[in-house]
């Protein structure tokens, strides 16, 4: 997830009419030394970012309601806090995947999460990390901020 989206969610979180209520986003943005005005994200864009995230949260929650023992692969997770917003039961295996430096930043900025949760530091286009993912249950792949960064060849493989 790009810094622009994170800032949009933080703006939404402090709005009196918040759509997503992503308070972890606001906390994380407050801890990052960056001039967020460079993102040029405005109120309506922040709402759009939050609405997109909320819809993906709804779909993820519906999948987990139907599959109480599922695996969620959250690809290119960035600093997204979907696992905290959804708060899945401990029967759900949740795996956040992103580049190693992004995972390190996640660990520094976001709280620890219990249950069957782990973070994998890898490019999602590398297949080696998939070898460690058990294929023993229904699996949902969530990739909100990924496809626009893939080359055509990466997207097709």
Model-derived segments and their meaning:
Residues 1-73, 77-122, 132-136:
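Rossmann-like AdoMet
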Residues 125:
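Adenine-nucleotide cofactor-binding loop residues
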Residues 128-129:
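Short acidic active-site motifs
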Residues 141-142:
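A conserved beta-strand element that flanks and buttresses the S-adenosyl-L-methionine
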Residues 146:
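Hydrophobic adenine-recognition pocket in adenosine-nucleotide-binding enzymes
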Residues 149-157:
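A short, conserved alpha-helix within the catalytic core of class I
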